[in-house]
A protein has these predicted regions:
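Phosphate-binding glycine-rich/basic clefts of nucleotide- and phosphate-handling proteins
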Residues: 1-45
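A glycine-rich phosphate-binding loop feature that marks nucleotide/adenosyl-phosphate handling sites
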Residues: 1-5, 74, 131-134
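Residue-level signature of catalytic and energy-coupling elements of molecular machines
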Residues: 2, 55, 77, 113
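Active-site lining segments that contact anionic ligands and/or coordinate catalytic metals
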Residues: 15, 30, 72-73, 96
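Tubulin/FtsZ superfamily GTPase core signature
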Residues: 39, 56-59, 99, 103-104
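Phosphate/ATP-binding catalytic cores across multiple sugar-kinase/actin-like superfamilies
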Residues: 43-70, 116-119
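Glycine-rich phosphate-binding loops at beta-strand->alpha-helix junctions
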Residues: 68-91
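Conserved phosphate-binding/catalytic loops in two-lobed NTP-binding clefts
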Residues: 89-115, 123, 130
Length: 134
């Protein structure tokens, strides 16, 4: 919740804050404190940079015929991480490729899996299984 509410991949023009409640790890007692969007950004910065490195590695291994499609159509972000503000802009900046956040990113994977199940025959060539698809 905090990651989505305050998280950002790039510094914001105006820092935002929120009150969080939890347990103090030193005393074990309940504690309330303020946390800023900049603190959250710094906390998630390293994992985000690792994700970008993996994206770059995948792009380097992409066959040329697919690379042109990616350059033309861009990268589409799905899932909860896609809700982190400016993640699309940072990935685009680091890769030089347009990046878009899909409509309803939290449901996109489920919708895509559902569409795949509707026509398994078309996907036989790219699916792997320990059993033969009938």
């Amino acid at each position: 919740d905090i990651k989505i509410r305050l998280g950002c991949a790039m510094p914001l023009v105006t820092t935002e804050t929120a009150e969080i409640r939890g347990r103090d790890l030193n005393t074990g007692l309940p504690k309330v404190m303020q946390i800023s969007s900049e603190q959250v950004r710094q906390a998630i910065e390293e994992p985000i940079l690792q994700i970008i490195d993996v994206i770059k590695m995948a792009l380097e291994k992409t066959p040329p015929e697919l690379s042109s499609d990616v350059m033309e159509r861009g990268i589409v972000l799905t899932g909860g991480g896609a809700l982190i503000r400016n993640l699309d802009k940072l990935i685009s900046q680091k890769t030089g490729i347009p990046v878009y956040v899909t409509e309803s990113p939290l449901n996109a994977v489920v919708r895509g899996a559902g569409k795949s199940l509707e026509d398994l025959e078309k996907l036989k060539s790219v699916l792997s299984s320990s059993r033969k698809l009938k």
